[in-house]
Every structure is written in structure tokens, then in C-alpha cells.
């Protein structure tokens, strides 16, 4: 290594000198780093042995490829600079001898440093290798091959060894015609270990080697296929070869053919290949360095062949670099990005087992994508397995997925190569099916091109979406091409349209390659300048170009070039009769007459007169242009159909397509006026064309009209095509009768088409337009007022027995009425022609006349017409037919309303002297009832920048939509935004505070409507209302309460405030208001169409009826009513035909099924998951054939821990139940009810609980009892009675009828017994008039319900038995059970603490001890005496902790008995004489005696702690148990363990005797409500605690507390408090002085002086917290009870180390206490005093009682000296 390094350094040094001679100075270290980079990038360079311009350029090419692949961050900054310098050094022919010497020396170094011996060849004559290994390694390999074995090392994976293709014999060592420079360049790339996997075959290393060079490469089967096709291209045609290869490849994938591989050299490893890949024999090379390092593109399964030709397969691990690269690509670009798919395809070119694929996918993809891939992979494997089964090759689903017997890796390694190919195909296909990152998964038709989106990007999105839907984009290429045009933007459509059928998808892309944002902008500007829309501009742009001749009308030339009207051939035109004066033959513009031939004045010439003809032939978007050869034809050219035809046929001159949306269109006929003299024309449509759906409007053609006669026509319902030359109308010529009417114009000429003399008008006269109508059969006469929004009836005409209500609406006109009255119900109006409708008029007093408003006139189809030309044209354009009414069926009122006035009616008078303007009441939701009018203000929460931006955008959208308005309301609640899965934001408002102030409305629909109640055979229409909440306005008085604020960051600006105008989401009453509003809107429809079955639930409406035409008419009226109410129907959600989707069901003909449901078992992990799943299943049960017994294992999973996140898992039984659910969902269906047939209710004896079914030849609805019984022990016959009650209730609820027949499993005699001995059966059958039977209909579907074996009581007798053993049982809450018989008593201990359950254990012991003997059992438990007899007939026992288990055990003992027994009840402790009372007393006494014996001190301590939560020291002293046992009792308590121990008592000044010094304070405990103020006083000598609950902490509350304390322990000498106002007041000072109590306060804001009472607060609150969670009465007690219990514990139960409680210390004070004697120094005068007794030794301080001054003093410990060890007793 040292020699090599020195050579390398010498090489770099010489190169540096050579550069220096050219004036280039470089650092040695930088140059050394540069050549290290050269070596890493071009590992072949040191082996070349020479350096020249050709090899150096190859180095530059490697640099460039490395830069393009890995980016600039991987390439040193100076790399290309140094390369250029050295290139100039080598390329330029130097004359400087120093430079040439340096170059020569450099070449020598390269030659001597070459590490490869390329002269040796392999010993195998069939396959020569260029070995880079040492001689020793080769010898070892040779020896191993002689023995017929491969290397003993673990087989390594080698790339495929390929030879160069030559035209010579394979044994020729000198190939010719090879581009060695290019081959070496590619080989150098391959040897770079950092290079990504190459898919092409690189050429050999060096042309100088004598043997045929071969290199390592991963062969791509597609490239190999292309090479084969290229070799055979000259022999056969390309298409035949392509088809043959495709057929062969398909056979390989299905396993019909196997792949054979040629033998290779012994010990040589070969990589698996795609089926059909051929590995040519030849000379290969293998590098030992490469053998020691597994290449990154070799994958798990490899195959080696030993010297004997035996193939061995090996499994290797994945290279981490490949997984990392694939993981990075999937994360950054997406799992289906082209780059990611390229890596996946390169991986798929190798042999990967199913386990390897699963490992790779799980490592690369996310959890969700992994599951998606796995499901798609399994689906692909199923399809492949089916094809394999047909082919008979034995490759089944288990082999393809690596499951079952093929789950081990060893088994998968032995797969056939063709099977590997099928696995790779299934895996890659599944990978391509993964969803695109960030794509919500829209449908293919929903992919549309954006306005500025490049067309190529749009096509790419289409192809990607098609690939996911069809499996591959090629499968839907025609569909993609169609959508690429239809969903393109207008600009691209215009570019494609001329070539749409002439090119393919790539041609589309080329045509639209230049269309971008700038093109769109220019297009919009061009359309704007031309006065057209962009669409019209593009359509006209592509039409035939060229001018139109204004003379002949033909295209292709202009008027100046017209040959038909050349000036030299033109005949002079002679004027006819002047149309102005009609008195001479001259031109009208030359007429100078002032009057016509009738003497009427002629208006002078001024301005533009009648509009002339269009400048050119008419073009239409929907029709073809007028044929250029069409000439203007006169009336005389028209033909008649037959000699007797009255009309002349009119034909269309263009091919036209009409749709209903286009409305009336004018069709050209090519016929021009004028008509023959003294005639006028009437245009009528032909009956044959009317039958085709084309409506021709009648028209009048004037005699003096000279323009083109056109036909007004429209398509009524469907698209109609009018071909050129079709006869569609007739022109009838009628005689013209001239009258003396005034003429407006001298002549019509070529004016606008149509008559100018006919208008649809109602003359205005002096009479009032009155109208007589009948409201609920009472006649009313009123004035037609088109300016009034509503109808108004005067109070004087209103019947007094008709109800009216007050409104919140103000009616305004010339007069004004505030809060007028309105009819409480809708009235039915009727006119003389029996037209009718509903109306809800207002009632106003003192009104001169009744007013019919627009709410009524609109229902009557009354029209207002105008004689104005513009208005007439507008009405014609909108579809108005002369003589016909408006509407789709034109069935409105045809004639004007009679205008006869009534003379006996007075005028308006002073009330209405002008036009009236009465505003209609605004339709809105009902007002909300509020608990309080006090404003509610909740501050707005701060929002992050992204959420604030989203909120601002959403608020702006709502503002533009009119859903909110600006506000200054005193109400405010916060808003927030959440991000949906689709990436869009949603605006929400926290209305909890507002909801708390409103009176909640009840639910209007407590349940979902069922589609089975729709009559059978009815046709249906289902609609969904769009944005229903946002379409319903809030009542104006309620809007201010739903205000919110939009904040700003850093308070940069005042908050913008808004309030909702529509129903807000999150408001508690919004659903109810929505239902009421929609119900009101469709009320008229329900009233008018009573024969229809209409279901309304929230925003879903279903209409069903017998007659389809009536259903459509009802739907039409429903649309009108909803539109009038401001509600909008979502067009995309209108369902008109099967299958319908409604409320989670699919309605297809007579069958009703649930929508396809998929149960995700992998998501079932917690109690919450199972709860939601079973809730959904329970919702589906009325439509499934599932019994409660079928679902019981699933219901059992809900038992256990109540934590929603507690773990749950599926048992085998639960999994089987879930499979039954899936099967039932897939197969279930129910049918609609037929109300003409009897309704039968069937009851089946299914397991656990009975199951009900409504039946009419097919199942209608399944009925189930609740999963949990209402009783712990519910007999089966009582369950059937409950099911009868439930079935009858459901029948009336959903169908409105009682079942005609109830079929149940009991016979008539059994029913009689049930009626006499049970309570439920008489109730269930009460008032039932139908048939009660037990014969089921003969139907196979009914037989699926297995009969349940039911029994009547047989073993348990209702009366005592004769000659039976007498047994008494009893149980105690201590867990002791006992039973006695004759003179024997048996007792045993249980682990139960309930007396009822313990006695049940005793009863089980009796039944177990005497299974074959009759028994008379007596118990003092009434519960057991009633429950045990029910066990014999109970099918399901409700789960209640231990109770269910014991009852099940007892039930099993009863089932196993064959000899009856009796159980009776006896009252305990009755004191009655006799054997029964005495026997019960013996059993009871046995439990009590035993209980007293086992009540040890430890159990007593445990019970005491459970009751009072005493501390460990008190338990130890009170019950004489060890200290550790006492501590364990406290530690095991779940309540006490959460509280810290009470701190040390401290060293505050204390009294020397009881009632000397008290400390007093107030603490708060909020859970006590108004009594949260706890006044606490403590005697500092004994620690005796007193506390009272008060409603405040003022002086009066303090005095009340002290008076209570004085009544218990008397008056103190001194009280110390803080400086609170209750303690420093004058009244409290007077109170203390009156009772001679010294009151002192501590230092302000220093609670340490009150340390004793402060610690007492903590002790008191801790004790309250403990006992309120216990099992004693304080759990449900009052605050005073809880406080008193806590004081009892602290004062009387807690003991100190002297075994005394606080009460003992207070009431039994021992004055003969021994004290230590000390001398002490007074710090004021430095004098010593004493000896005096020590009261308290503190931490650094001592409390000494001065006998001289009779007072205690606190002194520092350094001023105290103990004088003796003798103690003094202080009296």
C-alpha cells in the first residue's frame, strides 16, 4: 500500500509540475482530492495504464452523468475546472520538454499502478472469464470445481454475465466491429458503486484483451426482447413477431409454459430472469472485488450451478440502499410517481418471493397503503390462480401469496421461474393501483382542465386516473381520448375541433402545446373586442372564412366581384307602386307626397326607418348555414301537398338541432314576401311534426311584409333534429279586409318578423278589476292588486268562527298595519272554472275592499301583458304563446279576467289614494324561545396564521353567499376551523353557551322512516335539498344572538364582527327548525296530492305513487313550492329510476337491501370500536335474518372494563358471528308492503330470545328484542309476550295497522295456561282482534330459524312436596353460608359480601348435595324464592357481575334434576313457634356465630379504614396490629394513596391548657355550593377542631360560627386570626370584648403565623375528599353530614403517639406532665433567668414557660442552657 500511495503521490506531483510550467498554480492537497473524486467516479481510470485525450474525455462524460444523476451538491466545486486545465494540458501539443516529460512519467505511473491482469482466461473452454482474483483464489476455485462442488463460502449474488454480440464464431477471441470507446465508457459507469441500477447492457472493459469481453449487468427483459426483435426483423414481419412474442409471454405468465435456462460455468452464480429471457454463452469476467461486495441491484433469490450441473438456490437479504432509495422516492414523489414506478419495475425484474414483496412494501409504504397494496395483491393473485386452474399447472392461490403450506421462505425459493413472473406481475399491478398522493380519488369524468392548466398536464392526470380505474391506461385509451376533448377548456377544444377525428391523443397534445395563460388572456381580449363570449368567438373562429356577397348572398366573393349582378348585365329596375302615398310608381325615398291616397298625413323622412335585412346569410350555432345556392324564393314558388290542400308547405333551409333549453327559435324558410294582393298569411304547424315533439307557434304574415318568412318553433321535451327540406309548417292565405283603424306606419316592408297589429292586452277602463272567489266554500269579492304581495281580507267579511293568529310582520302601503292578524290555517280557494289552491290570507279591520295579492294571482296563472314591441318580443322569446297560457303544459288562464265593476262598492277613499305596496312576510324559521335576554359573550380564541387565513376566506365566502352579515351584536361566541380529509377547511362556531340560554324544541321525528312501508309497486322519485340549513333564514329577532368575531394577529386591527342570517350549524334547534320549515313548504303538495306517499326526513324527500305521470306532476309542484320557499334541489341527487339510494338503503324494484357494507376487522381493538360496530349492526337488524343468539358472542365483547379505550379482541365465537353478519348483509333483502294483503307477524323460537318477522309472501321487516333483557331472569314465554307487544307497536308505528294474524310457537292449551299464570300474556294480547295461531306458512325462508326448545315448569313445584327432606338456607354479608337439615348444620365461607348471593351459594350447595332426593327448601330471601322458579324457563340471563354466573350454575343443576323440589319463603326473626321458624333461626344463628369468630383485628382495621379512612398510626394503636400491616391497609386504599401525608404540626405558639389559644380562619370548598365557606377554629393545645358551613365570610357569619363553637367546648381566652375584613370590623371587636376574649391578628399577608389552622384546612379537606368517595352514608349525604363525619374522624378517631385523640387531649388533660428544666437569657437585658420548664423544643428555637412572669416565651436555642436531667412536674 505504501508503494502504491507513493506512486499516486508521484503521479499527482508530476501533474502539478506540468501545470506549473503552463503558469497554473494549484495546491497539492486540492489536486489530490480531485483525483480521489476521479477514482470514485471512474474506477476504471487507474487501471488504464495510460492517459490521453480520449480517456480524459471519458472522464468528463462520467463527471457530466454523475452531475445529472446526483445533482450539484455531490460534485466538488473545482472538479470541472481541474478537468478543463488537464484537458488543455493533454490536448495541446506541447513543445516544452518539461511538460512532455511530466506527461510521460504520468503514463508510466498509470501503467505500473494497473491492478488488473487481463491476459488470463478461464479454464472452462465453454465460458472464458476475465478473472480479477489472485492466483491463490483461482487455484482454490479450480480445485473445488474439480471436485464437482462450488465454493464453500456462502453463495454471493452475481449479476448476469453477458458476452458481446459478434458475427464471428463464439470461440474467436478477437471480436471485430465493436465500438470499444463507447463500450468502455458504459462499463465504467457500471463499475461505479454509487451509480443507480442500469437497465441496459454495458459493453466490455478493454479492447486489448484477447478474449471475448463480458461485463456484469442486470438485464431488463424488455430490452432483451427488443434486441431479439431487432435480430429477427429481417426474417419475419414485425407484426407477426410481435404477436407471437405477446402470445408466448401470456402463456408464461399463466404457467402454460416453463422457462429453461442454458447451463453456465460451474460455480457461477446467475441472477433470476423474466420468463423467456435468454442468457447467451460466451466469455465472461468476474471481479473478486465485486464478489466480496454484493451489488445493490441483486435481490433475494439467486441460483448457482455447481460443477456437476446441479442448480442451487439461495436467499439473500435486501440491500438497504435500494429500500432507502425506494422509500425516499415514495415519500417525496408519491407511491405511483413515474420515478418510483421505475424503481419498482427494476426491482420486479428479479426473483422476489411473496414474503420478500410483503417485507419490501411494509418497509417502504405507510400502514394504510400497505393494506391497500396487500388487498389488491391478493385480488390479483386470485384472478391469476383461476387462470392457472384452467391451464392445469397447479399454481394455486397459496403459492402465489406465500400462505398455507408455502408460508416458509424455503418453500417459496423452489418456485418455477414462470411462477415468479406471475408474482412480480401481480405485485407491480397492485402497486400501480395505489392512490395518488393528495388525490381525493375523483371519478374519471370529473377530471377537467383548468383555465390556465397546460393540456399535457391535464392529459397526464386523465391517464393516471384511468390507470387506477382500468388497471392500465391502455385499457381505456379511447375513453381517455374522448374525455381529453370534452373536458378540455374552450381554447384547447377550439384547437382540437378541426382535427378531432383525424389524429390521436399525441396529436391533441401537439396542437395544444402553445396554449397557455398568455393565449387565454389574448383570447379573452379578442372576444371582448368582438362583443362575443369566448365560446362563441371560438366557434365562429373555426367556421368557413371568406366574405359574403351583399348582392347575391353567396360566399367566396364580395359585391364588387359579383358576376351575377355585374353592371354591364344588370337590367334597370323599374319602381312599382309607392308604398308611402300609394298613388304613383316611384321610389319611396323620392316620394314628396304629404298625404296618401286616403288623405291621411304621411310622416316626414327622419332617422333610420324600418330595419333592413341582415348583411349576409344567417348563421346559427345550432344549425347549418343557409345553402349558398339557395335563392330568395317568392310565395309563388311554394307548393301544395295535394290539390285539395289549403296550406302552402314551408320547409327549413338548414339542418338544425333544437333542445328544450334553447326556447323558441326562428327557422329560415328562404321564402320572402310580399304576399299576393288583398291577402294575409297564417302560419300553422304540421300535425306530423307536432307528434315528434316540435311545437310551431302560429303567426300572422302581413300583406306588406317583404322580408323572409320564418317559422317560430321550439323543442318541447326532447332534442329534435330538423333536417334541411323537411316540411314543418303551412302558410294559409286568407282574404284581407281593410278597416278604418288608424295606421301607425305607412308600410311594413322588411321589418321584424311577426305581426305588428296583434297584442295580448287587457284594456284599462274606468271599471275596477274585481274578482269573485270562494274561500272554503264562502264567497268573497275583491280587487285584483298586482302590487300587493299577499292577499288581504277585511275583518268585516271574515267569519267569526274562523281562527286567526297574530303575526310579527308589518304590512306597508299607503297605510300601515303593524302585527296584523293572519288565518291560522290554509284555506282552499276556488274560482268559477273550478281551479283551486291553498292560501293563508291576512285579516285587517277597516279595509274598504278585499285585495287579491300576488300569492293568489300566481296560483291562478294570471298574466300581465303589454302592447309594447320590446315587451312582446321578450314574451315571445320566453315561450309565450298567443292564445295559450304560460307553464310547461300551457294550461293557464286563456282569457283576460272580466273587468266589470260593481257600482255598489265604495272606492278606496282616504285609505288608499294611490298604488298600494304591501310587502309579503319574509319566509323564515320560527322564532326561538329564550330563557333569558341577557347577552352572552364568550371571547374569541386566538387562531394560528394558517387557521386565521382559512377563517377569513370562509367568512368572505359566506358573506358573498348572503349567509352572514356584519354585526354589532352584544352576543359573541368563538369560531374555529378544522381541516377535512380532502384538505379543505370547514368553519365551525362553538354555540354551547348560546344553546344553554334557549328552550330546546322536541324532536319532530323520533325515528327514521322505513322504506318498507311504501306501498308495493309504487313509482318513486327521491330528491335531496342542497345546503338546507343555509337556505333557511333565521328569524330576524334571533340573528343577533349568533354573532361571532374574526380576530387579527397581534391585535393589528379591530375584530370584524358578523352574525348568521341562516340556520347555523351547531345550534341545538337547527334540525328541528329545518324539519318544520321544509314540512311547511311541502304542506300544499301533501294537501293537493293526498294519494301520493310522501316521506320527508330532514333534507331528503321521497315521492311515491301508482301513476308515473301523476308522480311527475306532483314532483313538478313540489319543485315550485320548494323554490318559492327558497329551498333548492341538488340536481345531481335527483333519483328517477332504480336502483334508488335512500337513508342508507338501496331500493331496486320490489327488493330493499342495505348498501354494501365492509366490516374492517383490523380496526376492532377497543371497547369504543366494538360499540360503534354493534350499533351499526343493531341498526341493520330489522332487515337481516339475524337472531340475538347469533349476535350474543359479539355482544359479550362489550362486557368488562368500562374504559372506552380498554382493549377488546374477537374470540372464535365472535369471529363466527361476524361472518354471519357479513353473509346476512350480502344476502339480505326485504320487500315493500302490499296494503291489499293481510299483514302477518311471525314469532320464531330462536336461541336466547325469540325473533319476529312481518310477512307477506316475502319478508318485510324483522323485529328483535333488546340485546340486554329488562330483567335478570326473563322467562322465554315472557320474552315472547314482550315481542308481541313490540310487534304490535311497530305495526301501528310504521304501517298504521294492526297485524291481522300473529303466529307464535305455543298451542291453544299452553296459551290458556299462560293467560292464567303470567302477567305479560294478558297485557300483550289485550284488545287484539286478530287471529292468534301457531301454524307457520310453508316457505323455505321461514325454516332458517331453528326452533328453540322451550319448557314449562316441571321440576320446581309450586306447592310443598310430601315425604321430602326439609332444608333451611341462610347467608350473611360476612360471606358465611349455611344450611340446616334435621339436627345437622353445614356452614362454609365464601368470598362474597352480599347476603343475597351468599344465600344463593348455600342453595346451590343444597341442590348439589341432594340431586336425587325430593326437597322442601325454605329461605328468608324473598328475592331467591321468586327468582329460582323462573330459572327453569329462562333462556337468557342478564349479565350482572357474579349474579349471572351463580344463576347459570343453579339453572344447570335444575336442568340436570329429574326429581322435583319446592322452594318457599319464610320471614326471618319473626319469633313464631314451630319447626319452620326454628329451622330458619338455626341457619341464621350459624352464620352469625361464625361471623363473630372470624372478625379479627385485621379485618376490623380494614373495615374501619374503609369507613373512616384512618391513618396508619391510628389503626396500629386502635386495633393493636403491626405498624407494617397498618401501612399496607392505607397503601392499598385507592382513595388514600392519592393524598400526601399531613405535614408536621410545626412550632406555632400553642396554648398551655385547653381553651387558652385558638386559631381561626375560613377556607372554601366549592362542591358544597352555597355553603362553600367553611369557618374553622382549632384549639392549639389539644388540636380539637371545630367547623361550620356558612353562606359567606362577613362578621355576622364569623359570630354565628363562634357561637356554635362556644356551645361545644366553651370560651377561649385568646383568638388569633388573619387581617380579613370579617375579623377586623368594629362589630367583631365589640363581640370579643363583651365576652372578654383577647383577639389578636398576625402579620398581614404572612400565613405562617396561622400555620396550625392552615394545616387544619388541609387535613379537613383531605378527609372530606376521602369519605365522600367511600361506601358509608356521606356518599349520598348533605354537606353538613359530610363535614360532621370528617370532624368526628379528626377529633375522636385519629390518635397521636401517646394513643390519644384530640378529644382526649382536650377533655382529659393531664396537668402532671413532666417538663425539662432550663436556664434562659433574656435578649433584651442580657440577664439569665430560671430554671423554668420547656414546653416545646422546636427546630432551632425553644418555648420556655417563665414561672416569674407566668407566660411562655420563644427563644433561640443558643440562649437556652439545660441545667439538669431532673424533670419538674408543673401543676
UniProtKB/Swiss-Prot annotation:
A motif (PTAP/PSAP motif) lies at residues 210-213, 335-338. Zn(2+) binds at residues 1505, 1509, 1533, 1536. Gene3D superfamilies: 1.10.10.200, 1.10.1200.30, 2.70.40.10, 3.30.70.270, Acid Proteases (2.40.70.10), HIV Type 1 Reverse Transcriptase, subunit A, domain 1 (3.10.10.10), Human Immunodeficiency Virus Type 1 Capsid Protein (1.10.375.10), Integrase, C-terminal domain superfamily, retroviral (2.30.30.10). A zinc finger (CCHC-type) spans 547-564, 576-593. One of its GO terms (cellular component) is viral nucleocapsid. Changing residue 873 to R: 30% loss of infectivity. A lipid is attached at residue 2 (N-myristoyl glycine). Residues 1716-1765 bind DNA. Residues 1361-1492 form the RNase H type-1 domain. Residues 867-913 form the G-patch domain. Nucleocapsid protein p14: Nucleocapsid protein. This is Gag-Pro-Pol polyprotein. The lineage of its organism: Viruses, Riboviria, Pararnavirae, Artverviricota, Revtraviricetes.
